[in-house]
Curated annotation (Swiss-Prot):
SUPFAM superfamilies: Annexin. The modification Phosphothreonine is found at T267. It comes from the Eukaryota. This is Annexin A3. Keywords: Acetylation, Annexin, Calcium, Calcium/phospholipid-binding, Phospholipase A2 inhibitor, Phosphoprotein, Repeat.
Length: 323
């Protein structure tokens, strides 16, 4: 059965001739020797898929009586440590941790919440919900409810429940009807009917939404993004704009997130690690192409000029090549 976490446009593929016990032994030596052999760790963990890494971790535990992630945490440091631990974490657990981190402490990282909830499929969201509850004994929905409010909260909860239609079939009649509802809910009236925007944008499939946005332009002579910007505000506006951009082109949306994470003073490693790891087996090749289109330079060169050391080497291996 194909994994819901693997697509056709990733940079990391199954390693041919994979032998988890050989890899586990090599990692044991790399960690247990005098000083850590980072080179071996990087080459094994970036050249295996997540499913293969989890098998290595299982062998490692049988061999050493310790969890691989715990030994990596104890032996490595900084952003390099976070990245390596992410590589040996199951995808749903990784996303659950990222969501927890974005809602922890003072203030909520709305951008991270929006990014994860808009780019994951319904099936993925359901798995993330289970992983979240297993790890924190609280439902993801309850956490979102206590950290957010208003229309933003309402929309996030629908996305967190994994209720978006996933079918690839489109219905032209429904697209026209939805486009008219959106027009009546915003441009055509005084004040805005936020629920209409939430229900359509959070529940319809991406192919269906693309058709709806075309119909919307025919009716209103405006692009849906411009209407959202004119009618809505705050995090709710940001969320709906993210949904529109993901429905149109998810890799382009994520490329823009990477561009912002790498641009200017300082690097947003939280975002950089998350996108590089979570999309490495799904669509990172497409994200790379969109990044170049957006910025005029390659993602590889941006990582190279913005990071250093083992952290840089690992990210470049995940990136998988220069464009």
């Amino acid at each position: 059965m194909a994994s819901i976490w693997v697509g056709k446009r990733g940079t990391i593929r199954d390693y041919a001739g994979f032998n988890p016990s050989v890899d586990a032994e090599a990692i044991r030596k790399a960690i247990r020797g005098i000083g850590t052999d980072e080179k071996t760790l990087i080459s094994i963990l970036t050249e295996r898929t997540n499913a293969q890494r989890l098998l290595i971790a299982k062998e490692y535990q049988a061999l050493c009586g310790k969890e691989l992630k715990d030994d990596l945490k104890g032996d490595l440091s900084g952003h390099f440590k976070h990245l390596m631990v992410a590589l040996v974490t199951p995808p749903a657990v990784f996303d659950a941790k990222q969501l927890k981190k974005s809602m922890k402490g003072m203030g909520t990282n709305e951008d991270a919440l929006i990014e994860i909830l808009t780019t994951r499929t319904s099936k993925q969201m359901q798995e993330i919900g289970h992983a979240y509850y297993t790890a924190y004994k609280k439902s993801l929905g309850d956490e979102i409810s206590s950290e957010t409010s208003g229309d933003f909260r309402k929309a996030l909860l629908i996305l967190a429940n994994g209720r978006r239609d996933e079918s690839l079939k489109v219905d032209e009649q429904l697209a026209r009807k939805d486009a008219q509802i959106l027009y009546n809910a915003g441009e055509k009236r005084w004040g805005t009917d936020e629920d209409a925007f939430t229900n359509i944008l959070c529940l319809r499939s991406f192919p269906q939404l693309k058709l709806t946005f075309d119909e919307y332009r025919n009716i209103s002579q405006k692009d849906i993004e411009d209407s959202i910007k004119g009618e809505l505000s705050g995090h709710f506006e940001d969320l709906l704009l993210a949904i529109v951009r993901c429905a149109r082109n998810t890799p382009a949306f994520l490329a823009e997130r990477l561009y912002r994470a790498l641009k200017g003073a300082g690097t947003d490693e939280f975002t950089l690690n998350r996108i590089m790891v979570s999309r490495s087996e799904i669509d990172l090749l497409d994200i790379r192409a969109e990044f170049k289109k957006l910025s005029g330079y390659s993602l590889y060169s941006a990582i190279k000029s913005d990071t250093s050391g083992d952290y840089e080497i690992t990210l470049l291996k995940i990136c998988g090549g220069d464009d």
